[in-house]
Amino acid sequence: MGIAKEFREFAVKGNVIDLAVGVIIGGAFGKIVDSVVSDLIMPVVGLVFGKLDFSNLFIVLGSVPEGTPYTLEAIRKAGVPVLAYGNFITVAVNFVILAFIIFVMVKQINRLKRETPVEPPAPPATPEDIQLLREIRDSLKR
């Protein structure tokens, strides 16, 4: 039972739970970024460059069997090696956007941390005997 108890203590620690929440949110956030890239950004980029679908951009590195449709999926099913650079472009744009969003978030968090001023601790109260000595000194000066 010692191992089970140790594991429970380990799993309930704040860092492990924070990590689990981060992974779950990161997975969901990754899906949002994928959707933004594939549904919003890549169609605009494709429109600008004259191609609407980057996923079908590829270079065939072998011979294509007769009767095989000239699509990436069909050529891959036929076992022909291909260089699928269109998919790479989509994934690279996805990565750049995700990295930029994370950069902006970290920058904002750091800014908020800097803006929160740390108040210096209040000086300790002057002991009563010192206070009395100061009052005596001040009265003698007059």
Curated annotation (Swiss-Prot):
It comes from Acidovorax ebreus (strain TPSY) (Diaphorobacter sp. (strain TPSY)). The keyword Endoplasmic reticulum does not apply. The keyword Cell membrane applies. Its main location: membrane. Disulfide bonds: none annotated. Channel that opens in response to stretch forces in the membrane lipid bilayer. May participate in the regulation of osmotic pressure changes within the cell. NCBIfam families: mscL, PRK00567.1-4, PRK13952.1. This is Large-conductance mechanosensitive channel. The chain crosses the membrane at residues 10-30, 40-60, 86-106. Homopentamer. It is a multi-pass membrane protein. InterPro entries: Mechanosensitive_channel_CS, MS_channel, MSC/AndL, MscL_channel. One of its GO terms (molecular function) is mechanosensitive monoatomic ion channel activity.
